[in-house]
Amino acid sequence: MAAVTYELIKTCKQTGARLGKVHTPHGSFDTPVFMPVGTLATVKGMSPEELKEIDARIILSNTYHCYLRPGQDIVKQAGGLHGFMNWDRPILTDSGGFQVFSLSGLRKITEEGVTFRSHLDGSKHVFTPESVMDIENDLGADIIMAFDECAPYPAEYDYVKKSMERTTRWAKRCKEAHTNTEKQSLFGIIQGGMYKELRIESANQLKELDFPGYAIGGLSVGEPAEIMYEVLDYTAPLMPADKPRYLMGVGTPDYLIEGAIRGIDMFDCVLPTRIGRNGTVLTSNGRVIIRDAKYSRDFSKLDPECDCYVCRNYSRAYIRHLIKCGELLGLRLTTWHNLYFLINLMKQVRQAIMDDKLASFRDEFYLKYGYTK
């Protein structure tokens, strides 16, 4: 039996969105779910205990970054990421593919793998499907991702086709190299850029490899929202209904809701932590740039409808003061609130699916948030 399994609980009659539960060796989590990103074995500014307080059920960490610092051997010696960072709930690690391919001029792609230079010190390294499986095995996450090539946007058809075909061959090599199947589940990643024919081909080829879960990669890389939704419209239905469906690197409120409507179960993004550190907060009435002068005497809470620790205890004026002064507490408070906002949003999405009202919820949320469909 696979280490990670999916249980479908309900399908929304209004939209077709899925309410489910993913079971892992470190516990279960309800879906659709947003996963906070802990790139270097930490969600920036948040302790594991604080993540539990905001009800984060699963977090993501990054293979590329943990391989470079502190190194897979140190993490393995600590008992994997769970022991190293004192987190006893599920963890997902990406394969590092996106980071390696983002290095652009610092890397070279061959059929064997990718040769790249560290962004830290320029040292030379090689990632192959086999070496990435070895690293992810040592990191010890419950869900590990196959090593894939993420094509840029825009990209020519011929380039994307070759890239997608290589990703499929690498996925097969990853599956052959992954032996720790009782403790970890390996997910395949559907690629193909913005080309329908290639997405369909990728999905069908990966389904033949029978992974315990599937992800859609190569989206939210600069394409317009309507193109991303179009790709989801024809790709998500091709993914097995009895396995988790993961949309990689997506985390704005509208993307989360639209992804759920299209049958996606799992999402991750650095957005809430990154914009939080820059002084932007997510609220039920849209984004608030808290460093703006107009909030200097605003003693109301960040979001009038939020009951998180930050909103219960601190004002906009105080948080603006902290951010303007470069105080670490300010960055922690905005990060805390933003993560809570998205985790709570997904709770509302799950309830709306249960009530068969997700489309209605979307319309009400968009109206208040300031989105247009």
Curated annotation (Swiss-Prot):
<feature type="active site" description="Nucleophile">
    <location>
        <position position="268"/>
    </location>
</feature>
<comment type="function">
    <text>Catalyzes the base-exchange of a guanine (G) residue with the queuine precursor 7-aminomethyl-7-deazaguanine (PreQ1) at position 34 (anticodon wobble position) in tRNAs with GU(N) anticodons (tRNA-Asp, -Asn, -His and -Tyr). Catalysis occurs through a double-displacement mechanism. The nucleophile active site attacks the C1' of nucleotide 34 to detach the guanine base from the RNA, forming a covalent enzyme-RNA intermediate. The proton acceptor active site deprotonates the incoming PreQ1, allowing a nucleophilic attack on the C1' of the ribose to form the product.</text>
</comment>
<feature type="binding site">
    <location>
        <position position="308"/>
    </location>
    <ligand>
        <name>Zn(2+)</name>
    </ligand>
</feature>
<dbReference type="GO" id="GO:0005829">
    <property type="term" value="C:cytosol"/>
</dbReference>
<keyword id="KW-0479">Metal-binding</keyword>
<keyword id="KW-0808">Transferase</keyword>
<protein>
    <recommendedName>
        <fullName>Queuine tRNA-ribosyltransferase</fullName>
        <ecNumber>2.4.2.29</ecNumber>
    </recommendedName>
</protein>
<dbReference type="GO" id="GO:0002099">
    <property type="term" value="P:tRNA wobble guanine modification"/>
</dbReference>
<feature type="binding site">
    <location>
        <position position="218"/>
    </location>
    <ligand>
        <name>substrate</name>
    </ligand>
</feature>
<dbReference type="GO" id="GO:0046872">
    <property type="term" value="F:metal ion binding"/>
</dbReference>
<dbReference type="GO" id="GO:0101030">
    <property type="term" value="P:tRNA-guanine transglycosylation"/>
</dbReference>
<comment type="pathway">
    <text>tRNA modification; tRNA-queuosine biosynthesis.</text>
</comment>
<dbReference type="InterPro" id="IPR004803">
    <property type="entry name" value="TGT"/>
</dbReference>
<feature type="binding site">
    <location>
        <position position="148"/>
    </location>
    <ligand>
        <name>substrate</name>
    </ligand>
</feature>
<feature type="region of interest" description="RNA binding">
    <location>
        <begin position="249"/>
        <end position="255"/>
    </location>
</feature>
<keyword id="KW-0819">tRNA processing</keyword>
<dbReference type="InterPro" id="IPR002616">
    <property type="entry name" value="tRNA_ribo_trans-like"/>
</dbReference>
<comment type="subunit">
    <text>Homodimer. Within each dimer, one monomer is responsible for RNA recognition and catalysis, while the other monomer binds to the replacement base PreQ1.</text>
</comment>
<keyword id="KW-0328">Glycosyltransferase</keyword>
<dbReference type="GO" id="GO:0008616">
    <property type="term" value="P:queuosine biosynthetic process"/>
</dbReference>
<dbReference type="Pfam" id="PF01702">
    <property type="entry name" value="TGT"/>
</dbReference>
<feature type="active site" description="Proton acceptor">
    <location>
        <position position="94"/>
    </location>
</feature>
<dbReference type="InterPro" id="IPR050076">
    <property type="entry name" value="ArchSynthase1/Queuine_TRR"/>
</dbReference>
<keyword id="KW-0862">Zinc</keyword>
<feature type="binding site">
    <location>
        <position position="306"/>
    </location>
    <ligand>
        <name>Zn(2+)</name>
    </ligand>
</feature>
<feature type="binding site">
    <location>
        <position position="311"/>
    </location>
    <ligand>
        <name>Zn(2+)</name>
    </ligand>
</feature>
<keyword id="KW-0671">Queuosine biosynthesis</keyword>
<comment type="similarity">
    <text>Belongs to the queuine tRNA-ribosyltransferase family.</text>
</comment>
<dbReference type="GO" id="GO:0008479">
    <property type="term" value="F:tRNA-guanosine(34) queuine transglycosylase activity"/>
</dbReference>
<feature type="binding site">
    <location>
        <position position="191"/>
    </location>
    <ligand>
        <name>substrate</name>
    </ligand>
</feature>
<feature type="binding site">
    <location>
        <position position="337"/>
    </location>
    <ligand>
        <name>Zn(2+)</name>
    </ligand>
</feature>
<feature type="binding site">
    <location>
        <begin position="94"/>
        <end position="98"/>
    </location>
    <ligand>
        <name>substrate</name>
    </ligand>
</feature>
<dbReference type="InterPro" id="IPR036511">
    <property type="entry name" value="TGT-like_sf"/>
</dbReference>
<feature type="region of interest" description="RNA binding; important for wobble base 34 recognition">
    <location>
        <begin position="273"/>
        <end position="277"/>
    </location>
</feature>
